[in-house]
Amino acid sequence: MQFPNLNLHIHSNYSDGKQKISEIVKKSIKLNLDYIAITDHLTDSWKAWVSTLNNKLTISEYLEEISICQDYLISNNINLILLKGIEIDLSSTEQFIKKIVTIDEFDLILFEYLQTYETIAYLENIIHYWKTQIKKPLSFPILGLAHFDPSFFMLRNLDILMNFLKKYNIYFEFNSSYPSFYSPRYERFFKRIKEYQIPVAIGCDSHNQNNLNDYDEPLDMIQYYNLERNLELFINTLDLRVF
């Protein structure tokens, strides 16, 4: 199967990225990307300084800017799918996340710092809350793990993690900015990803235009671990969401 060119982890100047959303879109067109997601940070933790997305007004402006770019792509018949995303820091307070995120406004949500069993329980509580807020089940966003470090769970019980990811259809991100997290030392982890049929996708964690298309190595590693079917599962979910 010929896989599309994916980068579902991009930061703009709404957080710690260097470019405007419109500049990212224009460059992505030139690079022949097929799918991109703008996923700026949302946090009230120690790293709150990195993001302006700390109130509903700014989030509304952020989403509107993405909408304008989406309309441009559609009206000009450009074959680039742009997703409205966000990257949520799981060391943020539960109150902040629940208050500021209107779940059906987003196409894709990444979670960073899922590091313990306690964090799984914390995130599951938030997902349950979101599911009570959603008006149409089909409008629930795609969920993924940003630059996930498998090491904690590798030393303990992988089944708890895998069952959680399977239950909520949360994908694993092969992130080209963190290649150590998909190195061969984690081969046992990726065997479980394959066994549990956990979706996988690609994100570059791009903060400037220089690495918007750094998807070759992640794709090579997906093939190395024989996870092509897992990537197909993700693309099928993505297409259902988009089309």
Report each predicted region and the residues it spans.
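Extended substrate/RNA-proximal surfaces in nucleic-acid metabolism proteins
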Residues: 46-174, 223, 227-229
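Short N-terminal binding/cap micro-motifs at the start of the first secondary-structure element
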Residues: 14-18, 44
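Short, conserved active-site loops that position catalytic residues or coordinate cofactors/metal ions
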Residues: 37-49
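Residue-level marker for buried hydrophobic side chains located in beta-strands
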Residues: 6, 37, 84, 144, ...
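Charged catalytic cores and adjacent phosphate/nucleic-acid-binding surfaces used
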Residues: 1-12, 21, 25, 101, ...
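Active-site metal-binding motif and surrounding structural segment of the metallo-beta-lactamase
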Residues: 26-35
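Short, histidine-centered active-site or binding-site loop motifs used for metal coordination
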Residues: 42, 113-115, 204
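Ser/Thr-glycine-rich phosphate-binding loops at phosphate-binding pockets of nucleotides
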Residues: 12-13, 35-39
